[in-house]
Amino acid sequence: MYDLIIVGAGPGGTAAGVYAARKRLKTILLTAEFGGQSVVSEDIQNWIGFPSISGTALAESFKKHLETAKGDSLEVREGVYVNKITQNGDHFSVETSGGTFETRTVLITTGSHRRKLEVPGAKEFDNKGISYCASCDGPLFAGKDVAVIGGGNAGFETAAQLLAYCKSVTLLHKNPTYKADEITVQKVLANEHMHALPNVDLVSIQGDKFVSGLTYHDKATGKEKQLAVEAIFAEIGNIPTTEMVKGLVNLNDFGYITVDPKTQRASLPGIWAAGDCTDGLYHQNNIAAGDAVKALEDLYLYLKAK
């Protein structure tokens, strides 16, 4: 029986793991991989203490920190997928791809995952020119014309990455104004190989064996237009990874875990959540880490009081 099971190893899970080890709680951290969503970022400039760090380097630093913190109280298992969490009397059962674990408390730091395109051609050309990971697939389209769907920070960061080796990058966004930070927008749009199409809707994706183009609707003119591209990189938002606790704790209308912002407690005693899987107003790496530490401090007191 564990005192605590931490699910996820992004900034939140990693921070909680370090603090749990220091408090000598019998803890196991379960994760599919390290790093969270930021693992795909080429240049992270707002992780405190690092003026610039890549997503892969950040993920590796998380892993190394946990390895350093590990002792006889903290266990880490990578490559494990959590399927379901259920209440079992005065404790919880965590069913995973690597077996079932019993614990007195659970901290969910699973973050969120990419929302997929839902237009004609999106399923047909998934992994055939449509990608949700520029770091993984971008180099395959060096010297090609490509498109990015989404006008948030993730969309512009993806465009910046692709501009390093693609012939041209066209970014399509559904609103007249962008959600990304202004400094990021200005920097990316200043590149001569960068094109932007705000206030448009993606209509469909065309191709034969692979993507050859897309059709979009220009809201200003009311006309549909075609754009020839050989790849489409989608950055259209995220879906919280909370399937394992559906029916166990309260979720909001969008599937995020509702928590008490003072303690990060979920609706069921013994369950805490932190980071992008929660209904917190802001989702950032540094916030996820802070929220997870807050949760850890609270659950430590909870355990000691029992």
Q: Residue ranges of each PLM-predicted region?
A:
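Residue-level detector of alpha-helix initiation sites
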Residues: 10-11, 112-114, 153-154, 279
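Redox-cofactor binding/interface segments in oxidoreductases and associated redox assembly factors
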Residues: 7, 108-109, 148, 234
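Rossmann-like nucleotide/phosphate-binding core characteristic of flavoprotein oxidoreductases
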Residues: 1-7, 19-25, 215-219, 225-231, ...
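Beta1-alpha1 glycine-rich phosphate/pyrophosphate-binding loop at the start
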Residues: 2-74, 144, 156-182, 252
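A Rossmann-like FAD-binding core segment of flavoenzymes
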Residues: 66-96, 100-103, 164-261, 301-305
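Glycine/small-residue-rich loop that forms an oxyanion/phosphate-binding "nest" at active or ligand-binding sites
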Residues: 76-142, 151
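FAD-site-proximal beta/loop scaffold in flavoenzymes
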Residues: 113, 118, 124-140, 236-283, ...
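Phosphate-coordination loops involved in phosphoryl transfer and adenosine-cofactor binding
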Residues: 1-3, 79, 127, 142-144, ...
